[in-house]
Amino acid sequence: MHTPAPSHHRSTTRRDAAASAPRKPLILVVEDHEFARQALGALLSAMDYDVIEAENGRDALAKVAKGARPDVILLDLMMPVMDGWEFMKRQRGDWRLCTIPTIVVTGVASHDPRCLEMPVVRFLRKPYTFEQLLAAIHAEVSAEVVTPASRQTA
């Protein structure tokens, strides 16, 4: 007489399949304006990105210290508590952050001399379109997939 396989076998197979599925890129949105931060989070989630939100640079550093490892950081410059400039200074000296591509979304001109010293990948000047933002994120996520070792050895 044939005995059917235990039912837990199917659930284990599903878990294994889920574990082997590609990981969604994780985007850290650092923006002090709650509406803008939540809107970006919702739009990026709808485009199949995982999102972590931080209201200022200090909050973003705390999330990384607790284990968050974003693939891309979207960073506003003008924020209270810790602005984007200070965040980038600390990013440059932190092994957990220094290789993460950073897209600055700001109204500040990108030709500011301080920008030359920072680990910024690109600037998106406000107002920008969601398509421009997605293209910038996609370019960084695609670069990470193609050359992951280059970011680890930097």
Feature-to-residue mapping (PLM):
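Non-catalytic signal-transmission and effector/linker regions of two-component phosphorelay proteins
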Residues: 1-28, 131-154
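Conserved acidic carboxylate
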Residues: 31
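Active-site residues of response regulator receiver
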Residues: 76
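Receiver (REC) domain active-site loop signature in two-component systems and cognate sites
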Residues: 79
